[in-house]
Amino acid sequence: MGLDKDGISNIAKERIASSLVEDTKDLAAELCKHFYNQGWVSGTGGSITLKVLESDVDVQERLIVMAPSGVQKERMLPVDMYVLSSDGTVLSAPPAKGAPHKPPKCSECCPLFLKAYKMRNAGAVIHSHGLESCLATMINPTAKEFRITHMEMIKGIAGHGYYDELVVPIIENSAREYELTDALAAAMEAYPKATAVLVRNHGIYIWGDSWISAKTQAECYHYLFNAALKLHQLGLDPADAKHGPLTRPQTLPDFANKRATSKNVFVLDIEGTTTPISFVTEVLFPYARENVSSFFKSTYNSPETLNDIRLLRDQVHEDLRNNVPGATEIPVESAGIDAVVAAIEKNVQAMIKADRKVTALKELQGHIWRIGYENGELKGSVFEDVPEALAKWDARGIKTYIYSSGSREAQKLIFGNTNFGDLRVYLSGFFDTTIGHKREARSYKEIFLTLGVDHPSCITFATDVLAEAVAAKEAGLQAVLLLRPGNAPLPSDHGFRTAKSLLEL
């Protein structure tokens, strides 16, 4: 089988150039305009993807047409569409446009779309940012499901009738779209009848066995969300068969007591606090350093890796402007994979050697480590007191968060694959440097505002780095320095409380 320089076979090229693909691109562009007029994809948000109707190919193996990210959907043209293989490999990308357009980028929804294709055998997936889909998740900010019954438009949802109760799972939002992938997959597995998943304060993912089914259901879902909002405004219950008056939850008086038991919060550093420094310096960093080249060569055309390359290009451009040692120009794509990967590897090695805390590096390391955890080459390491402390705090209603310079994905991988099992059940959230540098007080102020506690002093931040403790204290947090084996010595006059174990907190 002949392959071109990008590793695309001649057969795949013929499929990409077929009239079926062109027709699907035309349809995708037309639907983008329609959805824009519906208010579902304004501000470049939202997206759509369609399977190419290749009747002689199994649905799971058919080509995928996908709208790009960050593009005005009402001005979308067929040429703007990406063509992907069934596993998400980019086979055809749109040409770059001149200013003021940004370089084309495949939708960050891609990993979520692929889950719907794989788990539901979908023929089309729509991601809407329609206001009603956001507000529907806010009716009850603690609800994990949206429910409605006895409404005519329920009949438009696959597998449902007028008398059925429509249940749509709700997952929590994150700053980056692809971080929702695992939560979306879990919801799809837990709700086998569902044809949609709501994302709180964000929007909805809807799929069907064809574009007609997905579009029809999308229209019905948005209608039903609007209906539920209006029923609530009238004091009526959309989940009641007679849509009678809403009843106040009996547990409401307990809210104050629950708040009292959980008003204090722990925020933990990882390296030198929950995890030995040696694990990071002697295991994680070397693994990432040794696998940069193989990672890029094996995943080069995936949307996630293309985004890694974009972030690295941006960082290198900034480094070159600032004369950062070790920065090397990354050649354009036309130079070929080998040249691009070689330049990327030089830059990444220099960043790792200098222990740079930049997002581009941390995101990439997280993706490389993920492969290591998945194939069993890596296992997270935490001190013996960590699982016991986390379990005790959780039992007392105290929430625990992680704040590390490593990406949130890397943090989840460590705690999801530890020598004591999966500890993520005890953690309420993860912060990385996208919220700010760990040695800057404003970062901790942002964490305080995000967590919603009454006062910064309700937060105890545990770290092994004096400069981080100083920044946290400046923001009003309680700071504790951990004295772990292998940690750097502290000056005698540091002035902070110390602990040798999280159990002492």
From Swiss-Prot:
Active site: residue positions: 152 (proton donor/acceptor)
GO molecular-function terms, A-Z: acireductone synthase activity; magnesium ion binding; methylthioribulose 1-phosphate dehydratase activity; zinc ion binding
Key words, A-Z: Amino-acid biosynthesis, Hydrolase, Lyase, Magnesium, Metal-binding, Methionine biosynthesis, Multifunctional enzyme, Zinc
Binding annotation for Mg(2+): 269, 271, 464
Protein's UniProt keywords contain Amino-acid biosynthesis: yes
Pathway stated in the Swiss-Prot or TrEMBL entry: Amino-acid biosynthesis; L-methionine biosynthesis via salvage pathway; L-methionine from S-methyl-5-thio-alpha-D-ribose 1-phosphate: step 2/6; Amino-acid biosynthesis; L-methionine biosynthesis via salvage pathway; L-methionine from S-methyl-5-thio-alpha-D-ribose 1-phosphate: step 3/6; Amino-acid biosynthesis; L-methionine biosynthesis via salvage pathway; L-methionine from S-methyl-5-thio-alpha-D-ribose 1-phosphate: step 4/6
Enzyme Commission (EC) number: 4.2.1.109, 3.1.3.77
Reactions performed catalytically: 5-(methylsulfanyl)-D-ribulose 1-phosphate = 5-methylsulfanyl-2,3-dioxopentyl phosphate + H2O; 5-methylsulfanyl-2,3-dioxopentyl phosphate + H2O = 1,2-dihydroxy-5-(methylsulfanyl)pent-1-en-3-one + phosphate
Superkingdom of this protein's organism: Eukaryota
Pfam families xrefs: Aldolase_II, Hydrolase
Protein's GO biological process: L-methionine salvage from methylthioadenosine
Residue segments, region Enolase-phosphatase E1: 266-505
Descriptive protein name: Probable bifunctional methylthioribulose-1-phosphate dehydratase/enolase-phosphatase E1
Organism: Physcomitrium patens (Spreading-leaved earth moss)
